[in-house]
Structures are given as structure tokens and as C-alpha cells.
């Protein structure tokens, strides 16, 4: 599972079904006990998304997505992230950056709200990720990254992600590549491949840096 949030929520929703039977969108369809999510990394955005990402025994990586999987509360406590190694901090931060960028340039359900949240997330990640990597005990940087991850998660839950995540999930499932690292490698390649189709939105993001 993508995070400790995903497993108990999915199991509470449909304890008598296999995880594979819940693959896809709106397969849980059952209310679960409201719960609070307390992230210890700034990356997945699980504290505000509908998705539980699963890698099965065949190395196939897929999502179980349902509105009931969204936590009722998110507690963003920077002290819980201070012991995170610099490498994991960087990789999870770049996962959040990819969420924000793909949400911003996507055309699925892109709104003024999702674009605003994505812009805020991108600006914060560029400013505070190097600081958190250099000094993991910097609580201001940790808090800003947690908030950015939350905003990026909120944005992509509405606007969706794109081809970067599609490829990153495949690499992660087949070769156990950390998700944030796969995103970091693929994001610039995919943005270049998009060419003029993404230039206007990417220029808008560049203006916030």
C-alpha cells in the first residue's frame, strides 16, 4: 500500500473482498469510521486524496479510489518529519511537486481552485525542499512542505495526474523504484515531450518561483 493510511481504510470499507476486487474507481462504496491522517512525509498527499495505491504479488501497481478513503481530518505536525533522511525528504518532496505540476497542466477537471493550490505548492516546494534536505530539523521548512504536499494532493485529487505518474507506477511496480525518485527522473522528460501543449501552463508556474 502507498501509505499506512491506505491499508486500514480500505480494509474497513470492504473486509470480505480482496484488494484486487476493489481496483479502480468507486468500488468500495461504503461509509467507514471517520479517521484522522497524520503524515510523516511530505509527498504522497494521502491525507487528502481518494486513492490507496497497491502493488500486488505480480508487481502490478494500481489504485483503489473511492471518496470514502479521504480522511476526515489531516494533522500536519512538522516534528514528526524531522528524522526523515535527506534522500527520502527529497524523493517525497519531488512526488508532491509532480502532483502539483501534473494537476496544473492537466485538462481533466482543472479549476481555478486546483490551479491556485498547485501554484502555491510548487512555490513552497522550490523554496523549502532544499532547506529541509540540508537541515531536517528546520520546523518551518518541514511545515511548509507538509502544507505543500496537502495542497498538491487536494489539487490532483480533483484535476488528476498524468503520464509521469502512469510511467512511475509501472517502474515502481516492476522494479521497486521509489515512487518519488521515478517521478523526479520522468517529470522533465515528459514535460519536454509535451512540447508546446504544456508551455503556457509551465510558464505560468515558472512565474511563481
Descriptions of predicted regions:
Residues 51-159:
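Carboxylate- and glycine-rich phosphate/diphosphate-binding segment that chelates Mg2+/Mn2+
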Residues 174-209:
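Gly/Pro-rich interdomain helix-loop hinge
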Residues 43, 150-183:
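Glycine-rich phosphate/pyrophosphate-binding beta-alpha loops
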Residues 1-79:
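Glycine/threonine-rich beta-strand-loop-alpha-helix active-site module
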Residues 94, 122, 164, 183-184, ...:
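A general structural signal for well-ordered alpha-helical segments in protein cores
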Residues 4-11, 100-101, 125-128, 149-153, ...:
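Buried hydrophobic packing segments
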Residues 8-14, 29, 156-160, 170-175, ...:
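Alpha-helix C-terminal capping segments
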Amino acid at each position: 500500500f502507498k501509505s499506512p493510511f491506505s491499508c486500514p481504510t480500505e480494509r474497513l470499507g470492504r473486509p470480505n473482498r480482496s484488494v484486487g476486487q476493489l481496483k479502480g474507481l468507486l468500488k468500495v462504496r461504503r461509509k467507514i469510521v471517520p479517521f484522522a491522517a497524520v503524515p510523516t512525509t511530505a509527498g504522497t498527499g494521502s491525507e487528502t486524496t481518494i486513492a490507496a495505491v497497491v502493488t500486488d504479488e505480480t508487481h502490478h501497481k494500481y489504485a483503489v479510489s473511492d471518496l470514502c478513503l479521504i480522511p476526515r481530518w489531516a494533522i500536519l505536525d512538522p516534528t514528526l518529519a524531522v528524522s526523515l533522511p535527506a534522500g527520502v525528504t527529497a524523493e517525497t518532496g519531488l512526488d508532491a511537486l509532480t502532483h502539483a505540476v501534473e494537476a496544473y497542466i492537466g485538462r481533466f477537471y482543472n479549476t481555478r481552485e486546483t490551479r491556485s493550490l498547485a501554484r502555491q505548492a510548487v512555490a513552497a516546494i522550490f523554496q523549502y525542499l532544499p532547506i529541509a534536505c540540508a537541515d531536517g530539523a528546520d520546523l518551518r521548512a518541514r511545515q511548509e512542505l507538509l502544507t505543500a504536499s496537502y495542497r498538491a494532493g487536494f489539487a490532483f485529487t480533483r484535476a488528476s495526474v498524468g503520464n509521469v505518474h502512469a510511467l512511475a507506477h509501472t517502474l515502481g511496480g516492476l522494479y521497486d523504484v521509489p515512487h518519488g525518485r521515478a517521478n523526479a527522473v520522468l517529470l522533465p522528460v515528459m514535460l519536454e515531450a509535451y512540447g508546446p501543449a504544456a508551455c503556457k501552463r509551465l510558464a505560468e508556474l515558472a512565474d511563481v518561483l
